[in-house]
UniProtKB/Swiss-Prot annotation:
SUPFAM superfamilies per record: Ribosomal protein S5 domain 2-like
Role, per record: RNaseP catalyzes the removal of the 5'-leader sequence from pre-tRNA to produce the mature 5'-terminus. It can also cleave other RNA substrates such as 4.5S RNA. The protein component plays an auxiliary but essential role in vivo by binding to the 5'-leader sequence and broadening the substrate specificity of the ribozyme.
EC number: 3.1.26.5
GO terms, biological process: tRNA 3'-end processing; tRNA 5'-leader removal
Naturally occurring in which organism (per UniProt): Clostridium botulinum (strain Hall / ATCC 3502 / NCTC 13319 / Type A)
Name recorded for this polypeptide: Ribonuclease P protein component
GO MF terms, alphabetically ordered: 3'-tRNA processing endoribonuclease activity; ribonuclease P activity; tRNA binding
Length: 111
C-alpha cells in the first residue's frame, strides 16, 4: 500500500499543474495520468478546515472511503489528489463517501 500514496511535495505539485480538477461542495479532486499500472492517492486538508483532530479525522474518512470503494470498476494508472473543503469538517462517513464517488464518476474513472 506504500507505493499507492503520493507523499512528496514535488508529486503533489505535478498533479496540481498537469492534472484536471473536479469539485463538489465537500471535496476537490485533481487527477493526472501516471506511468504506473496503479492508482496513487494523495489527501490534503488545509488548516482552515479545523484543528488537527478534525483535519486528521477528515483525512481518515477520505482514505477509508477510497479504500472501501477501490475495486475492479475503477480505471488504473492515475494520480488522485483529494482536497477537503471547509464544509467537510462536520460531515459523517456517508457524506464523504458519496462526495468521493461523485467526483470519481465525474472524472470518468469509476463505473
Amino acid at each position: 500500500m506504500k507505493e499507492n500514496k503520493i507523499r512528496k511535495n514535488k508529486e503533489f505539485r505535478h498533479v496540481y499543474r498537469r492534472g484536471k480538477s473536479y469539485s463538489n461542495r465537500l471535496l476537490v479532486l485533481y487527477i493526472c495520468k501516471n506511468r504506473c499500472n496503479i492508482n496513487r492517492l494523495g489527501v490534503s486538508v488545509s488548516k482552515k478546515v479545523g484543528k488537527s483532530v478534525i483535519r486528521n479525522r477528515v483525512k481518515r474518512l477520505i482514505k477509508e472511503s477510497y479504500r472501501l470503494n477501490l475495486d475492479e470498476n475503477m480505471k488504473k494508472g492515475y494520480d488522485l489528489v483529494f482536497i477537503a473543503r471547509n464544509s467537510s469538517n462536520d460531515r459523517d462517513y456517508k457524506d464523504i463517501e458519496s462526495a468521493l464517488i461523485n467526483l470519481l464518476k465525474k472524472a470518468g474513472i469509476y463505473n
